[in-house]
């Protein structure tokens, strides 16, 4: 083991340090005592004798200030620090926050449990350039002397930027007489104004900087890019104002620009200080300028040009005329008359062919240079090509087809810069290996021939100089008569080889597509005109010789704009983010890249006349105030990208009329059209041969373009002949397709599976949805969708097709691939917060169960929350038999209709077969509201059930076909299969009407009131079915008149206080008192009542164990339902624990025990408020 990483043999002490206000914290005048003080304050070990010794040392070194230790004590006698734990005098303090004091390690250890939540690292002290006047403290000897107490600043220094400085007023057309002090090129140079006021101001601020920072000592400061700091110049070691341009944290250096002198350099971080607020905020003295009206001929200023201009104007006093003000006043476009030449600088640049006027297009290279290179290469090729094999039939193979959004693992094969990367798919490694073997065999059987002279642009086999292996290569040019420049099309690199190292290639070897994928990192750009060598080296270190996850975000100039992530790193980070954070690149919008037209391919599409008017358009929007809207999904690409439209009859009618006008416009439009990326147009959809509004996404080759139909969201590639220009009148209606993504979920395995897509499509496609906006990002609207009363995200989570966003996936506790006999038992005790949440239900594999032809189809079991309940069909009022009460949003009644006895008997038989073949039950933790199989304690048989509550060891269930409840151990719970849920439960899930006004968490008083109301005679009226629950209106029968329970509950919610009814029967009042006495229990009162009946619990409606299903007939006779009576007795006492009323609400809590404690605290607070209010 490396001793540098060896663990210490002794456990380190908690962070304690001596307080700065103690007797030994006075900062001495000499340098040596400061060192001793720092060691003392940083000490983590409490040693009494050692501290005393150090006190003596400090006293001796501070002899010029303190006459004796007693003097120091008397001086600081006014400051007393108390231990944060025991309140005794504490002379030690936490080294982390440097604020909390303690008297010993023992007290600090006891207080650490609470203190760690507020203990934050202290901010390094910054020495102020102007110390505050300190209060004079008399000496103990009474001589009248004073001792100033130094005040240290713990506050974070304020960062200062250019915007915080005063603006220099320079008007357009004004003349400035100045001297050029620094010149990089004609597009960037600095001048100093020649005036006495500027010279005096510059001298003054320079003196302020030297006075503030020359003698200061501070810790290393980490500036931000764009911040103004005080920087020590390397040549004269003086301090000047500078702007931070880049920060290299690894090398502890930063690139700075001296704003008062115009030059720049790289300095160490310890030579940088935060700029004090006391430094005058005068504008930069160096005015940044550029020569107006010109730009470089070849796209960048050449070295020859810079030298000529430097000799012409550098260090000379000239009169500059301000022709334009750019970059919010930070850059002045100027020109000056050079007296020695008799012409302006701009004219000189144009005359010397260094620059051209701004309105002339720039060419990256002159036509003469390009022509010379092509001519030389062609002459070298044709010189000895007469009658030889030019390999003209071997054309380059097609490139690999990649689409935006594709993601794959790749290996970088060649890299020149972040804008020029070539990589190979890792999944094609075996194909490439086989290709290399075929090339080796082919070339070994093909002899070299003097007759073979391939033409530029053709493909052949080339022997690579480094490993002497054969590869497919494209002939780029002839550098001489017998040497050729080739590019290896499967790897991206190129080299110059001799002609005798080339071989002709067969058609079979050209069948495979080009394996090198040209890429560029999306979203970043170089800090200068070109990428620096340091940036390229860092990128090679990050991506070369390792597996990289590549995702295609767009396309530009024939390259894929990608993001790259090294999945082997910990933590995983984007290469783009790393380059930006390390100061090697700047952020650039990806959308800008996508919207730029490809000049190489746009010319292949017929040109149209330039558009005279500037088109303007808008897109449909969704409210972001929590309002639910009706949506219809029109295009589904994935759960992270789908398009929908806000369903409105008015907009639908308008869209129909606009489509008719669009059709007439396209039939009459005859002018050719040139597609431009990011511009709208009319496109013909080949699916139905109709015209629609579209947006150009990409200009492809062969006269085609890729468009997105803006009212529906789908995209396709169309011919240029099927594109028409659009008019402004057809753009008045906002684009109807709204890009959305499903919020709150993410893929289980990193990518969305096909099953999740199909399930999402089944829930949402082609039907109205209820949606609410949760967030807005660059991906569109993050939506919460409801389909048929179900939250789509909750359904996907409960079916194990998605997981909550940001949740760390726990390893499965039961391996599905193992036989049932090999499943290990879970521990007998398991904290509730380790249970699988509603998003990840447990699944049990049943592959190990023996099957016979008459057995059920075996499928994996789970604890589904979205089990389907019966939909009532009652036309009038009826008297419900309440089985269990959770809240007004969720309660269960027995099926008031006829029971299908034969179907129920078959289900019971299937349940018995399924459960008998399961392994020894594990202590699974289903969530409240989930369906399951439960073993009845009366006869040890298995029945279908619904979980009401769960603790660490037990579950409170209701038997879904009989209505009685009991508490069973978790070992008596098994998952249930989808086949066993086909037959509907005999308990019916219900809710009061008006659910949209109900809260997520119900007040305890309202739950108590609702339980009391249901304890008497109740009549119900069916109002509808929302896809999840039957909506009922309940009426309480009370002698003279009926009372609407729905109105009572809504009124109680609105008033916020509960007034008990004076007409309640006496037994109800007693039950209410009994409820108040039982509020201290951590479980519901329903459960408490059932525990009193646990000794006399009957099995689920079974009178004879030999006939397990015969008692099902008792559902037809209400008077014989003893279990219903038990249920009614239980429901007369309401739940004191707020149950989760939907699967979506359950996702927000992962610890039931903590939730119960919080509910209990809320009850006590409400009780206290009521008592105070009554007084």
Curated annotation (Swiss-Prot):
GO biological process terms, semicolon-separated: germ cell development; meiotic cell cycle; P granule organization; piRNA processing; spermatogenesis; transposable element silencing by piRNA-mediated DNA methylation
Record localization: Cytoplasm
Domain annotation Tudor: ranges: 222-282, 453-512, 674-733, 925-983
Binding site for Zn(2+) 2: 94, 97, 115, 119
Record Pfam families: TUDOR, zf-MYND
Subcellular location, principal: cytoplasm
Gene Ontology annotations for the cellular component aspect, listed alphabetically: cytoplasm; P granule; pi-body
Domain of life: Eukaryota
UniProt KW Metal-binding keyword: yes
PROSITE patterns named among the record's database cross-references: TUDOR, ZF_MYND_1, ZF_MYND_2
Keywords: Cytoplasm, Developmental protein, Differentiation, Meiosis, Metal-binding, Repeat, RNA-mediated gene silencing, Zinc, Zinc-finger
Binding site for Zn(2+) 1: 83, 86, 103, 107
Skewed-composition ranges (Basic and acidic residues): 1115-1128
Zinc finger (MYND-type): 83-119
GO molecular function: piRNA binding; zinc ion binding
Region (Disordered): 1-32, 827-852, 1060-1089, 1115-1136
Biased segments, Polar residues type: 1078-1089
Biased composition annotated in UniProt, kind: Low complexity: 8-19
Task of the protein: Plays a central role during spermatogenesis by participating in the repression transposable elements and preventing their mobilization, which is essential for the germline integrity. Acts via the piRNA metabolic process, which mediates the repression of transposable elements during meiosis by forming complexes composed of piRNAs and Piwi proteins and governs the methylation and subsequent repression of transposons. Required for the localization of Piwi proteins to the meiotic nuage.
Family in the record: Belongs to the TDRD1 family.
Protein name: Tudor domain-containing protein 1
């Amino acid at each position: 083991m490396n001793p540098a990483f060896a663990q210490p043999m002794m456990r380190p002490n908690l962070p304690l340090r001596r307080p700065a206000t103690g007797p030994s914290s006075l900062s001495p005048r000499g340098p040596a005592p400061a060192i001793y003080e720092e060691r003392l304050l940083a000490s983590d070990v409490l040693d009494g004798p050692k501290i005393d010794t150090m006190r003596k040392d400090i006293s001796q070194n501070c002899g010029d200030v303190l006459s004796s230790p007693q003097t120091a004590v008397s001086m600081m006698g006014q400051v007393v620090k108390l231990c944060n734990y025991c309140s005794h005098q504490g002379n030690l303090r936490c080294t982390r926050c440097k604020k909390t004091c303690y008297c010993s390690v023992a007290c600090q250890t006891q207080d650490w449990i609470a203190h760690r939540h507020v203990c934050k690292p202290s901010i390094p002290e910054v020495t102020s350039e102007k110390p505050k006047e300190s209060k004079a403290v008399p000496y103990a000897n009474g001589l009248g002397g004073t001792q100033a107490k130094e005040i240290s600043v713990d506050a974070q220094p304020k960062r200062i930027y250019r915007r915080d400085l005063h603006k220099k007023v320079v008007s357009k057309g004004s003349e400035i007489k100045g001297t050029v002090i620094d010149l990089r090129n004609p597009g960037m140079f600095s001048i100093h104004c020649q005036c006495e006021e500027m010279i005096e101001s510059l001298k003054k601020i320079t003196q302020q900087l030297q006075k503030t920072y020359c003698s200061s000592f501070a810790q290393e400061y980490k500036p931000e890019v764009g911040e103004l700091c005080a920087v020590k110049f390397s040549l004269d070691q003086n301090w000047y104002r500078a702007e931070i341009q880049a920060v290299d944290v690894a090398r502890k250096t930063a690139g700075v620009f001296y704003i008062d002198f115009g030059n720049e350099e790289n300095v160490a971080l310890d030579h940088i200080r935060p700029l004090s607020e006391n430094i005058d905020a005068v504008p930069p003295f160096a005015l940044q300028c550029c020569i107006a009206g010109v730009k470089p001929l070849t796209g960048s200023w050449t070295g020859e040009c810079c030298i000529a201009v430097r000799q012409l104007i550098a260090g000379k006093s000239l009169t500059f005329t301000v022709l334009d003000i750019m970059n919010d006043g930070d850059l002045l476009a100027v020109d000056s008359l050079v007296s020695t030449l008799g012409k302006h600088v701009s004219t000189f640049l144009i005359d010397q062919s260094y620059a051209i006027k701004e309105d002339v297009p720039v060419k990256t290279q002159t036509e003469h240079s390009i022509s010379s290179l092509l001519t030389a290469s062609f002459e070298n090729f044709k010189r000895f090509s007469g009658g030889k094999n030019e390999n003209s039939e071997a054309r380059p193979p097609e490139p690999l087809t990649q689409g935006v959004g594709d993601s794959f693992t790749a290996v970088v094969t060649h890299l020149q810069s972040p804008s020029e990367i070539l990589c190979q798919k890792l999944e094609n490694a075996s194909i490439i290996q086989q290709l290399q073997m075929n090339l080796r065999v082919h070339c070994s059987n093909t002899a070299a021939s003097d007759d073979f002279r391939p033409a530029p642009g053709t493909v052949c086999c080339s022997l690579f100089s480094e490993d002497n292996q054969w590869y497919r290569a494209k002939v780029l040019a002839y550098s001489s008569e017998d040497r050729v420049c080739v590019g290896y099309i499967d790897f991206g690199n190129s080299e110059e080889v001799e002609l005798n190292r080339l071989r002709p290639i067969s058609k079979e070897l050209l069948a495979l597509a080009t394996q090198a994928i040209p890429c560029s990192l999306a979203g970043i750009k170089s800090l200068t005109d070109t990428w620096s060598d340091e940036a390229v080296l860092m990128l090679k270190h990050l991506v070369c010789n390792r597996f990289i996850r590549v995702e295609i975000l767009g396309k530009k100039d024939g390259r894929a704009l990608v993001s790259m992530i090294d999945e082997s790193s910990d933590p995983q980070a984007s290469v783009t983010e790393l380059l930006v954070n390390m100061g090697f690149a700047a952020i650039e919008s990806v959308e800008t890249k996508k919207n730029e037209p490809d000049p190489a391919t746009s010319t292949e599409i017929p040109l149209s006349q330039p558009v005279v008017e500037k088109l303007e358009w808008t897109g449909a929007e969704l409210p972001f105030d929590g309002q639910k809207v009706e949506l219809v999904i029109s295009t589904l690409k994935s759960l992270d990208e789908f398009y929908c439209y806000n369903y409105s009859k008015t907009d639908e009618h308008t869209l129909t009329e606009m489509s008719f006008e669009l059709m007439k416009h396209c039939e009459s439009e005859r002018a050719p059209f040139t597609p431009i990326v990011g511009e709208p147009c009319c496109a013909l959809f080949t699916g139905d041969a109709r015209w629609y509004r579209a947006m150009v996404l990409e200009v492809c080759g062969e006269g085609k373009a890729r468009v997105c139909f803006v009212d529906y969201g789908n995209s396709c590639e169309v011919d240029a002949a099927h594109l028409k220009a659009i008019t402004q009148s057809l753009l008045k209606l906002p684009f109807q397709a709204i890009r959305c993504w499903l919020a709150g979920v993410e893929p289980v395995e990193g990518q969305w599976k096909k099953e999740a897509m199909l399930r999402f499509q089944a829930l949402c496609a082609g039907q109205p949805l209820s949606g609410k906006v949760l967030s807005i990002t660059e991906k569109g609207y993050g939506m919460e969708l409801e389909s048929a009363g179900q939250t789509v995200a909750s359904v996907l989570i409960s079916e194990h097709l998605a997981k909550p966003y940001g949740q760390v996936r726990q390893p499965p506790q039961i391996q599905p691939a193992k036989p049932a006999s090999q499943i290990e038992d879970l521990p007998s005790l398991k904290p509730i917060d380790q249970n699988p949440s509603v998003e990840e239900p447990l699944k049990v594999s049943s592959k190990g169960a023996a099957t016979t032809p008459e057995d059920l189809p075996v499928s994996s079991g789970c604890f589904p929350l979205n089990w389907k309940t019966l939909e009532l069909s009652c036309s009038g009022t009826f008297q419900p038999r309440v089985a269990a009460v959770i809240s007004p949003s969720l309660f269960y009644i027995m099926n008031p209709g006829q029971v299908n006895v034969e179907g129920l008997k078959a289900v019971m038989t299937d349940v018995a077969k399924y459960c008998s073949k399961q392994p020894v039950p594990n202590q699974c933790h289903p969530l409240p509201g989930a369906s399951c199989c439960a073993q009845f304690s009366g006869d040890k048989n298995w029945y279908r059930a619904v979980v009401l509550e769960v603790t660490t060891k037990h579950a409170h269930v209701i038997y879904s076909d009989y209505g009685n409840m009991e508490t069973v151990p978790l070992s008596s719970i098994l998952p249930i299969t989808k086949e066993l849920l086909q037959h509907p439960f005999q308990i019916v899930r219900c809710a009061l009407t008006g659910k949209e006004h109900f809260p997520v968490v119900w007040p305890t008083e309202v739950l108590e009131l609702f339980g009391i109301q249901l304890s008497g005679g109740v009549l119900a009226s069916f109002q509808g079915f929302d896809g999840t629950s039957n909506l009922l209106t309940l009426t309480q029968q009370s002698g003279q008149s009926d009372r609407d329970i729905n109105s009572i509950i809504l009124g109680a919610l609105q008033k916020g206080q509960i007034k008990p009814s004076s007409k309640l029967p006496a037994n109800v009042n007693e039950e209410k008192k009994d409820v108040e006495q039982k509020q201290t229990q951590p479980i519901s009162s329903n459960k408490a009542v059932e525990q009193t009946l646990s000794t006399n619990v009957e099995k689920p409606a079974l009178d004879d164990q030999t006939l397990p299903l015969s008692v099902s007939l008792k559902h037809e006779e209400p008077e014989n339902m003893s279990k219903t009576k038990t249920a009614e007795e239980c429901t007369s006492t309401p739940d004191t624990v707020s149950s989760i009323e939907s699967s979506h609400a359950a996702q927000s809590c992962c610890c039931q025990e903590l939730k119960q404690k919080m509910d209990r605290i809320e009850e006590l607070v409400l009780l206290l408020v009521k008592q105070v209010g009554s007084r």
